[in-house]
């Protein structure tokens, strides 16, 4: 008798479960892999402290963040952030009351600010490899780096507004010709001055070198109103601009 009652109850339970499952299907639950989530959060945190200059200096991206950085650089995230920074810079530029003496300056860095070296870094694992200056120089000498579209737009806007544009780059003076050609082919024209590292600048940190060049601008009577760069060393130091705009770059760090 007990066996019969048990079988009846079991049959009813199964039937009810099947009915409920048919009428009210259970939601499909996808369990996000815990390790993948942990790694992504770790890499997001790493990029945050990098972009806020709280992790310095560093030589390569963490190995576990290689896929994360790649997806960020080639996906929509990088472009959206570049666009946002450039849009904010453009709004600021339009708000400035320029003097009548032609002494208001906007400084642009070149690499990862006006020109993109993403084709090079895609072949070098997006910053996972230790920087090789010989290989990078070969890339520079090709003169094929494309423009960052939003930076080109900002560049043209500040020129139209009446700013004098200075290009201040860590590239060597021996790369002047190819840099000029690359910039012009990418759509950049009419800058006031292109400043590259001379023989006396080798061995200096980027912060020191760029500070010295900005000091010279100020001594000549220029007002540094805006500055755009992908490295904190483009922006910090002495004779800083009234406002600086940091473009994202999780692939490498320059002191």
Curated annotation (Swiss-Prot):
It catalyses: a phosphate monoester + H2O = an alcohol + phosphate. InterPro entries: Acid_phosphat_B-like, Acid_phosphatase_pln, APS1/VSP, HAD-like_sf, HAD_sf. Its EC number is 3.1.3.2. The keyword Glycoprotein applies. Glycans are attached at residue 142. It comes from the Eukaryota. GO terms for molecular function: acid phosphatase activity. Residues 1-15 form the signal peptide. CDD domains: HAD_VSP. It is an enzyme of class 3 (hydrolase). The keyword Ribosomal protein does not apply. Keywords: Glycoprotein, Hydrolase, Signal. NCBIfam families: plant-AP. PANTHER family: ACID PHOSPHATASE-LIKE PROTEIN (PTHR31284:SF7). Belongs to the APS1/VSP family. This is Acid phosphatase 1. It comes from Solanum lycopersicum. The lineage of its organism: Eukaryota, Viridiplantae, Streptophyta, Embryophyta, Tracheophyta.
């Amino acid at each position: 008798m007990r066996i019969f009652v048990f079988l009846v109850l079991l049959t009813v339970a199964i039937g009810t479960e099947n009915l409920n499952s048919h009428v009210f299907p259970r939601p499909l639950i996808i369990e996000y892999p815990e390790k993948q989530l942990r790694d992504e959060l770790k890499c997001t945190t790493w990029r945050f402290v990098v972009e806020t200059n709280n992790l310095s200096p560093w030589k390569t991206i963490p190995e576990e963040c290689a896929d994360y950085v790649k997806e960020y650089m080639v996906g929509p995230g990088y472009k959206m952030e570049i666009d946002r920074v450039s849009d904010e810079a453009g709004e600021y530029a339009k708000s400035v009351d320029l003097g009548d003496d032609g002494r208001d300056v906007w400084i642009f860095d070149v690499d990862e600010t006006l020109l993109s070296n993403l084709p090079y870094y895609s072949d070098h694992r997006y910053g996972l490899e230790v920087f090789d200056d010989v290989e990078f120089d070969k890339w520079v000498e090709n003169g094929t780096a494309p423009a960052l579209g939003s930076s080109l737009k900002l560049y043209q806007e500040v020129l139209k507004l009446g700013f004098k544009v200075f290009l201040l780059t860590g590239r060597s003076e021996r790369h002047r010709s190819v840099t000029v050609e690359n910039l012009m082919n990418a759509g950049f024209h009419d800058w006031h001055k292109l400043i590259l590292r001379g023989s006396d600048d080798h061995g200096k940190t980027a912060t020191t070198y760029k500070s010295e060049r900005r000091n010279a601008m100020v001594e000549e009577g220029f007002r540094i109103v805006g500055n755009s760069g992908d490295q904190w060393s483009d922006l910090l130091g002495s004779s800083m601009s009234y406002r600086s705009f940091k473009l994202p770059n999780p692939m490498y760090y320059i002191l």
